[in-house]
Amino acid sequence: MPVRAILTDIEGTTSAVSFVFDVLFPYAREHLPAFVRRHAAEAEVATQLEAVRAESGEADADIERVIEILLGWIAEDRKATPLKALQGMVWEQGYRASALKGHVYPDAVATMRRWKHEGYQLYVYSSGSIQAQRLIFGCSEAGDLSPLFSGYFDTTSGPKREAASYVRIAEAIGRPPAEILFLSDVLQELDAARAAGMCTCGLAREGGELDGHPTVSSFTAIEPAAC
């Protein structure tokens, strides 16, 4: 069954891990406390603060305690959905103020543009919130790349290391898993996607292999038609 859609990870795949850890996370860590204090009463933020209380098991946590929990999760690189949502809100302010520009590897930009021209549907699946995904590509160093993508998926579709998440994504895309090529730099994610029936290709930008999966160091080496 030929590949018709391409689902890509971001961190370590389309974009440098260092951009996330050296730029985005420090920016969120610096600006999140003031953002939460300023906007805590707004419905969108308040919903996420309640989710933090629920996930942490501290139903009575005040705003300052919630901030402490969030900063702890950032330090742990915890994939908590309410944290990702709040980080996305903070990053949006940074992008809109031109304090942040999304990093996307030039080879990924050029190849995804070619794939779009060739008729492939492109989708993103990342542990970062959909809002954060849109910002990385919509406010990137290469300009607005959002027209390339047909949709975005985050942890609301399920954990990235569980096959069921990829089954749900295939259903949302409306294609059999065998028609979808998944790209990632994480072996366990590739294993989960393959278990769901997707084609896979690993990105090892510093070289090496992702056991059991075709592995490349650049998007230019990926041939969806050969999967």
From Swiss-Prot:
Catalysed reaction, written as an equation: 5-methylsulfanyl-2,3-dioxopentyl phosphate + H2O = 1,2-dihydroxy-5-(methylsulfanyl)pent-1-en-3-one + phosphate
Note on cofactor: Binds 1 Mg(2+) ion per subunit.
EC number from the UniProt entry: 3.1.3.77
Gene Ontology molecular function: 2,3-diketo-5-methylthiopentyl-1-phosphate enolase activity; 2-hydroxy-3-keto-5-methylthiopentenyl-1-phosphate phosphatase activity; acireductone synthase activity; magnesium ion binding
Cofactor or coenzyme needed: Mg(2+)
Protein purpose: Bifunctional enzyme that catalyzes the enolization of 2,3-diketo-5-methylthiopentyl-1-phosphate (DK-MTP-1-P) into the intermediate 2-hydroxy-3-keto-5-methylthiopentenyl-1-phosphate (HK-MTPenyl-1-P), which is then dephosphorylated to form the acireductone 1,2-dihydroxy-3-keto-5-methylthiopentene (DHK-MTPene).
Assembly notes: Monomer.
Protein name: Enolase-phosphatase E1
Organism lineage string: Bacteria, Pseudomonadati, Pseudomonadota, Gammaproteobacteria, Pseudomonadales
